[in-house]
């Protein structure tokens, strides 16, 4: 068992078995797996697949681009970017179990030639400078306290002119009180939200010039209300396989938005050469 509290939060221990059992219960053959079968479980961020599509369109992804997915989870977004946009995707995640399961699911859908995963720390990325055309991250920074290192590392591995595509939950200005648990943290000890102004300053400090800044908090509130109303008896495949007690956590997200404690932002920033 890991001693890192963030990795521990996302470690189940039997995740692959749970996902495969869920696939069977939902009527799918895990040995002949189609990509669409994983939809209910492979994207655990606001809006699910729709959030991935919106960020990809904002980033203007092009065929042949090499994308680094920081905090790649079960690999759903990475597989989607490779399948729909013709990108090669490298995923990196702190949680060893997520990396292993993402790689196995990717093998089962036949995309392991263009989508790969490895374990790594977002504040100390195991990649060379200027390697990627796009750095992609969704709902990851909320667990990372060392934000200057995070943004510096994402900029370091981006080629000049490359883009950072991020989709994150932020603290409202002034950091109002947030109620726990939430999907990324059981309590405040592993939650590290930045405000919009703090995030913009971090981007600028890393040489990342904002090109798109979309506040989608109002739309997110509706999604969080949906999470709060999930059935007590969940379907075979769903976010409950990764994040227990999702109804309570979804309700706290909605409460955070309603009370003005949270904001949700889609951002694209360009890696500019310092003058």
Where are these regions (language model features)?
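Class I SAM-dependent methyltransferase SAM/SAH-binding core
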Residues: 66-70, 74-124
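Conserved Class I S-adenosyl-L-methionine
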Residues: 212-275
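A short glycine-rich, Lys/Arg-flanked "PGG" loop and its adjoining helix->strand segment in the class I
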Residues: 148-163
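N-terminal auxiliary segments of SAM/dcSAM-dependent transferases
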Residues: 1-25
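Short alpha-helix
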Residues: 191-207
């Amino acid at each position: 068992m890991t001693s890192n509290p963030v990795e521990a939060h996302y470690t189940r221990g039997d995740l692959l078995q749970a996902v495969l059992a869920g696939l069977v219960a939902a009527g799918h053959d895990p040995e002949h797996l189609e990509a669409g079968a994983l939809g209910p479980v492979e994207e655990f961020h606001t809006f699910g697949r729709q959030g991935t599509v919106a960020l990809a369109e904002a980033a203007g992804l092009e065929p042949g681009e090499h994308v680094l997915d920081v905090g790649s989870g079960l690999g759903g977004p990475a597989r989607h970017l490779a399948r729909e946009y013709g990108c090669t995707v490298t995923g990196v995640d702190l949680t060893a179990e997520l990396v292993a399961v993402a790689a196995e699911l990717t093998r089962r859908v036949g995309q392991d030639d263009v989508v790969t995963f490895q374990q790594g720390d977002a504040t100390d990325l195991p990649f060379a400078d200027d390697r990627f055309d796009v750095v992609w991250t969704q709902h990851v920074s909320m667990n990372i306290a060392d934000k200057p290192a995070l943004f510096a590392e994402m900029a370091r591995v981006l080629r000049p002119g490359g883009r950072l595509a991020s989709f994150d939950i932020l603290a409202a200005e002034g950091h109002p009180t947030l109620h726990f648990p939430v999907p990324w943290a059981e309590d405040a000890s592993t939650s590290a939200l930045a405000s919009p102004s703090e995030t913009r300053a971090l981007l600028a400090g890393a040489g990342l010039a904002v090109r798109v800044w979309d506040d989608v908090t109002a739309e997110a509130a509706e999604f969080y209300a949906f999470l709060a109303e999930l059935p007590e008896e969940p379907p075979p495949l769903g976010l409950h396989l990764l994040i227990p007690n999702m109804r309570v956590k979804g309700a706290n997200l909605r409460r955070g938005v309603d009370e003005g404690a949270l904001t949700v932002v889609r951002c694209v920033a360009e890696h500019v050469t310092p003058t």
